[in-house]
């Protein structure tokens, strides 16, 4: 472990703030791995005075960065992507160590950063406005998009670096600087990535405060960032409760937000589904990252005619899930991130039973020698109805609810009409992030992605709820928050729109033909 940390510039005790210089004289936070509870390193958090210094430096960096031509900004971001690519294996290993993701997912998160850097570089030559015809003679009207300023990014523990990159890479090519507040329980990957960004900036004679960092408590540093009028846009990944608070605070100062909050994602499995395709998608969605993704599959809305076969196949698959040290290549599910997460899962399992559902398998703690530290559980499969209170909530862990729809003796033709019932159940939760349907029938697929279908920001056909690509806009509706990260036009969220009218005549005609004065 020490070789890995040394390679990435992680010391036994690290400064938790960066705005061109590394600072941190606040309380020290010890970071332990959920793999076995052992210490990784410590971080000195930033004080409120240091926060002021960092945001001031980020604002100063913006003043110069916004004047750099966008394609040149894109080149800097491209180089950051190359630097991340070279460090992919080491950074992925640190994600695994800090979060508990299996090795493939740790490296996959780093690949997301690489992908968005490549994507943002391409967009740096496409930050275009439109020219509109003017109703006035010898006038031209057009729009421009200008950099917004300082962008604040509050990321969550489950994707400790990828979500930052979605905002920072696009924000940077748009001419903004970024102040990043990562989750306090996963700060080391943030420090490692910021060090790489610093190297790239210095190599290009760019003020490295373009990529600033503030590690501290949510109630102190996080709250300062949300309230700060110098920060024009706040992107927050977190719970619905946190999102409501942030939206209220930022709304009071008429700032902008991108909110990626809770998900209660469902897969509809129809009578026409190919279960050979559906099964691995369900498994990856439900137990990947130990069920700690915003897009994790929480519900299966299954046609009664295929329920028995699907449940039996899921039980066999769950029994074969290899749970343990995520650094080992054979492991499919690692630990939950915290002991609180374990307790929340245990409470959810108990509530399923008390509210009238049935636990079909799993939902137990693993506390033997092969699973040290108390963070390991078996994934839970439960039968439930959609209206159970626990089903309406998001439990951030590997619990999957099987919910029935349709008639067991319906003909295949009749079952197509029953997809409306499935969609009604699907949409009857407060959240609206990601969704999917598995079917070989065109009518069912088209209905699901129509205006009458899924009410989520993401709706897939024959692919699961997890595993979004950079080219698609990511975000949701309802309690999931609103706003989008990544995607073809997400850059507009990081810029301000300006309309320009140019008069090349020697007169001053007014719009709408208004006559004013003599």
Describe the residue ranges of each PLM region:
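A short acidic/small-residue loop/turn micro-motif
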Residues: 23-24, 45-49, 273, 367
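Residue-level signal for inorganic ion chemistry
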Residues: 37, 73, 95, 117, ...
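Glycine-rich loop-to-alpha-helix module at the N-terminal edge of alpha/beta enzyme cores
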Residues: 38-127
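ALDH superfamily catalytic-core signature
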Residues: 196-199, 241-386, 407-416, 461, ...
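Hydrophobic face of amphipathic alpha-helices that form TPR/SEL1-like repeat modules
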Residues: 1-36
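Rossmann-like NAD(P) dinucleotide-binding subdomain of oxidoreductase/dehydrogenase enzymes
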Residues: 129-277, 413-416
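Conserved C-terminal structural/oligomerization subdomain of aldehyde/semialdehyde dehydrogenase
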Residues: 36-42, 205-206, 231, 268, ...
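Generic secondary-structure signature for well-ordered alpha-helical cores
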Residues: 60-64, 82-89, 100, 122, ...
């Amino acid at each position: 472990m020490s070789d890995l940390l040394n390679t990435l510039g992680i010391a036994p005790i690290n400064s938790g703030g960066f705005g061109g210089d590394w600072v941190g004289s606040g309380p020290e936070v010890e970071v332990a791995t959920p793999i076995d509870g052992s210490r990784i390193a410590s971080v000195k958090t930033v004080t409120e005075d240091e926060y002021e210094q960092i945001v001031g430096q980020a604002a100063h960096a913006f003043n110069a960065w916004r004047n750099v031509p966008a394609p040149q900004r894109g080149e800097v971001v491209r180089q950051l992507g190359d630097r991340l690519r070279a460090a992919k294996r080491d950074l992925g290993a640190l994600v695994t160590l800090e979060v508990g993701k299996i090795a493939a997912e740790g490296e996959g998160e780093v690949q997301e950063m690489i992908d968005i850097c490549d994507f943002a570089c391409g967009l740096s030559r496409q930050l275009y406005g439109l020219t509109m015809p003017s109703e006035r003679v010898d006038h031209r009207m057009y729009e421009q998009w200008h950099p917004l300023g300082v962008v604040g990014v509050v990321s969550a523990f489950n994707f400790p670096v990828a979500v930052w990159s979605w905002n920072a890479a696009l924000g940077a090519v748009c001419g903004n600087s970024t102040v990043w507040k990562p989750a306090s329980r996963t700060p080391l990957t943030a420090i490692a990535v910021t060090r790489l960004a610093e190297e790239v900036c210095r190599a290009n004679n760019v003020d490295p405060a373009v990529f600033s960092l503030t590690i501290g408590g949510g109630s102190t540093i996080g709250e300062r960032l949300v309230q700060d009028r110098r920060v024009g846009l706040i992107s927050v990944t977190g719970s619905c409760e946190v999102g409501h608070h942030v939206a209220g605070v930022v709304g009071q100062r008429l700032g902008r937000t991108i909110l990626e909050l809770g998900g209660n994602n469902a897969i509809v499995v129809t009578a026409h589904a190919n279960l050979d395709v559906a099964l691995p998608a369900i498994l990856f969605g439900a137990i990947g990252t130990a069920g700690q993704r915003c897009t994790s599959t929480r519900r299966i809305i299954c046609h009664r005619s295929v329920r028995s076969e699907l449940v039996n196949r899921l039980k066999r698959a769950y029994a074969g899930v290899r749970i343990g040290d995520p650094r080992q290549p054979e492991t499919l599910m690692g630990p939950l991130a915290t002991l609180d997460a374990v307790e929340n899962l245990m409470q959810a399992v108990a509530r399923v039973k008390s509210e009238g559902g049935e636990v079909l398998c799993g939902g137990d703690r693993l506390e033997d020698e092969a699973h040290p530290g108390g963070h390991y559980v078996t994934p839970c499969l439960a039968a439930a109805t959609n209206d159970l209170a626990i089903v309406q909530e998001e439990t951030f862990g590997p619990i999957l609810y099987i919910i029935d729809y349709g008639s067991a003796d319906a003909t295949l033709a009749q079952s197509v009409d029953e997809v409306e019932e499935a969609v009604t159940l699907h949409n009857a939760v407060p959240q609206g992030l990601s969704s999917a349907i598995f079917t070989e029938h065109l009518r069912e697929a088209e209905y699901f992605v129509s205006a009458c279908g899924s009410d989520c920001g993401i709706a897939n056909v024959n692919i699961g709820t997890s595993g979004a690509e950079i080219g698609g806009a990511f975000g949701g509706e309802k309690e999931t928050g609103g706003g989008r990260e990544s995607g073809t036009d997400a850059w507009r969220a990081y810029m301000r729109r300006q309309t320009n009218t140019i008069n090349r005549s020697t007169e001053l005609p007014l719009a709408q033909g208004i006559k004013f004065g003599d």
